Amino acid sequence: MTIKPLIILPDPVLRQVSTPVETIDADIRRLADDMLETMYDAPGIGLAAIQIGVPKRLLVLDVTKEGEEKQPLVFINPKVVRSSEERSVYEEGCLSIPDYYAEVERPAAITVEYVDREGKEQAVEAEGLLATCLQHEIDHLNGVLFIDYISKLKRDMVIRRFTKAAKTRGAKAI
């Protein structure tokens, strides 16, 4: 397993819409393993493949509490098929937007259909942190960032801050 470098805002790669995974093979399973290692190293609780520059519909999560045994989850081609009308607000952060957090309102409960790392079709009903994290990571697969849910003024300030930091690093900007 390999820790991969993270794509950081304002890199335009983060706005790409990811393509479906066609075949679940050793390469996809290795990618999932690399993503989990990268996520744990960061440390984070979720990571979409696009965040390491791979535009595939693949994400990994682990929302276990610190001190509990790890429960890594792999979602291939995930799709939200049901969302509750009830909403919840969580303070979200993102490994691609380091050290910035904002409250985001999303459906409180969702049902997601996906394919697991063995190629089996699955469905999960999620609420709480798992629902929020799944929605956040699925957004990444669609080129959407959590800052898209905050006011334009705040979003523009965040993008300016990260664009300025990217220029000092010599990185690409949106």
Swiss-Prot record:
GO molecular function list: metal ion binding; peptide deformylase activity
Disulfide bonds: none
EC numbers: 3.5.1.88
Essential cofactor(s): Fe(2+)
Active site: 137
Amino acids binding Fe cation: 94, 136, 140
Superkingdom of the source species: Bacteria
Co-factor note (free text): Binds 1 Fe(2+) ion.
Catalytic activity entry: N-terminal N-formyl-L-methionyl-[peptide] + H2O = N-terminal L-methionyl-[peptide] + formate
GO biological process: co-translational protein modification; translation
Keyword annotations of the record: Hydrolase, Iron, Metal-binding, Protein biosynthesis
Cited function: Removes the formyl group from the N-terminal Met of newly synthesized proteins. Requires at least a dipeptide for an efficient rate of reaction. N-terminal L-methionine is a prerequisite for activity but the enzyme has broad specificity at other positions.
Protein family (similarity comment): Belongs to the polypeptide deformylase family.
Protein name: Peptide deformylase
Species this protein is from: Rhizobium meliloti (strain 1021) (Ensifer meliloti)
Gene designation: def
